[in-house]
Amino acid sequence: MIELPEPDGTLAPYEPSTVPRGFTPSNAPFTSRVVFSTAHVVADPMAANTTLLLGFEPFRPPAIDWDATIAFRGHLWAQGFAVAEALDTQNRAMGLDWSASAELIRRSAQEAHAVGGRIAGGVWTDQLDPMRPHSIADITAAYEEQIEFVEGVGAQTIIMASPQLAQTAASPDDYAAVYRHLLAQATTPVILHWVLPESDPRLTGYWGHTDWDAALDAFAAVVKSNVDKVDGVKVWPVSREREIQLRRVMPEGVHVYNGDITDFPELIEGDEQGHSDALASVFGPLAPVIAGGFRALDAGDTETYRAELKSTLPLAQHLFEGDALSMRFFKTDFVFLAWLSGHQEHFRMIWGEQSARSVPHLAKAYRLADGLGLFPDADLAEHRMRLVLETAGIR
């Protein structure tokens, strides 16, 4: 028995699981849906990784434990997931600049090819100075540089929405011109990733409109005029109703990738008019249970699929708990659970984000994950949870 702290400061007894659920990786991708998971980056615990920047300190490249970082991707490929690399889960622009992101994509692509896994890499415009304005030509060239690199290492391209483009574009035509130029040059179909201002206010007015329906029409027009170059789209955060609307306006054959934390079981299962696929950050820490659900769906067992994925919702929502600012520290939970699960040997992070979640929050994550049987070694997980409690003065 272990006593876990509650948000009000009291301690509540909890009896950890003694026998973890059995998960047998199949090393084969899912067949019923395309399922991407992102994956966190493992920091080098012995290095002087910089603390959170205030905006005026010189940038210092992060020190990454590459072996542990790539090993976690191997865990995901073995479960059947494709891996989406160098997005916000990997500290993109929150510790990792383009140079570090490129190295991450290169190493992950090399390992993906070795094990037969699917890999995609995010392209952005983050090599541009964020403190000064840039022309459309500058932004286009930045995108082109990163696309050339990602394609060159054999990864699929995910084109992320650019804050610099949002700042510079004067009309919907400017957005359309940039994206059509990039898509015309792409050698393989890409994923278009549009983040809404609810998550990143810098992207307000993307596609030249602040109205959702008008922006969606402009976005869909770009996809429809380049349908042979678009594998799929991800828009986040969107409601259940808006994701279904997105599915209805996309051309046939273009995947709509879900990444939410509330309705993903139903949206991915779909309805008589179609379904979503997945490009989800939250699948990384939930991988064994999520994989079991998709294996059931592959076999036509929708009842087990629903039960497995719905069982993860309380933990998924807890990992992203908080307002728009604190929600960004979901990576702390991801690293914490990876450490408890034995995927890495320490609980240290780039920018010192291991301290970004409260001890009661981490304790609840432990309890929910243990309840799902996510820990391969329940005794190890309990021991490491006790270390966190002792560090906080809880004995």
Task: Give, region by region, the residue ranges found by the protein language model.
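General structural feature for long, well-ordered alpha-helical segments within catalytic domains
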Residues: D65-A68, F72, A100, L104, ...
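Catalytic alpha/beta core domains of metabolic enzymes, predominantly
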Residues: P189-M327
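Alpha-helical scaffold segments in soluble metabolic enzymes
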Residues: R107, H181, A221, G292, ...
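Charged, low-complexity C-terminal accessory regions
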Residues: M1, Y14-S17, A28, M131-I136, ...
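Active-site beta->alpha loop and helix N-cap motifs at the rims of alpha/beta catalytic domains
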Residues: E3-R21, S26-D213, W351-R357, L372-R395
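Generic preference for well-ordered secondary structure
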Residues: P20, R60, D67, E85, ...
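Short amphipathic alpha-helical segments, especially helix-boundary/capping motifs
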Residues: S37-T38, Q79-E85, V153-T157, A218-V222, ...
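Structured C-terminal cap/extension of enzyme domains
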Residues: E266-R395
